Amino acid sequence: MGQTLLILVDTHVVVWLAFDQKQMSKKARATIDEARNLGDGLAISDITILEVGTLASRGRIQLGISLESFLQEIEARFVVLPITGRACARAIGFPASYPKDPADRIIGATALVEGLSLITADREIRRSRLVPTIW
């Protein structure tokens, strides 16, 4: 059976999946479970790997395993979507009301370019209504 549901996951949700699922909404958890049950249903942007690595190297999160092992786990559990020129162009064109953080912009633009919904707790992203979100 082919992939029938693909959902883009924001960086903080990746961290919460690994360490603190109680932070996630019931709807987010249910959507993640559904996507996993239907095949390769969870995706991340390349930039999420950079963000997780940066958080770990700065001591903001404790991985409990080597960064390399954690990143291998991420790559095994998620479809990793590359940062494309189309996504960059889309991110640059976002209105000023969208979060300014370049990673947030790339993740949101990736969702739009790929036609995916984004699981995120980020209120600014959700309020923008620019990207289809699940929370």
Region locations from a protein language model:
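Short, well-structured N-terminal submotif of metal-dependent ribonuclease cores
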Residues: M1-I44, R58-Q72, E114, E124, ...
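Short acidic-hydrophobic, aromatic-tinged amphipathic segments that line or gate anion-handling sites
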Residues: L81-P82, T133-W135
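ABC-type ATPase nucleotide-binding domain
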Residues: L55
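Phosphate/NTP-binding elements of NTP-utilizing enzymes
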Residues: V52
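Alpha-helix capping/helix-boundary segments
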Residues: V13, T48-I49, A87, I107, ...
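Phosphate-binding/catalytic loops
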Residues: I92, R129, I134
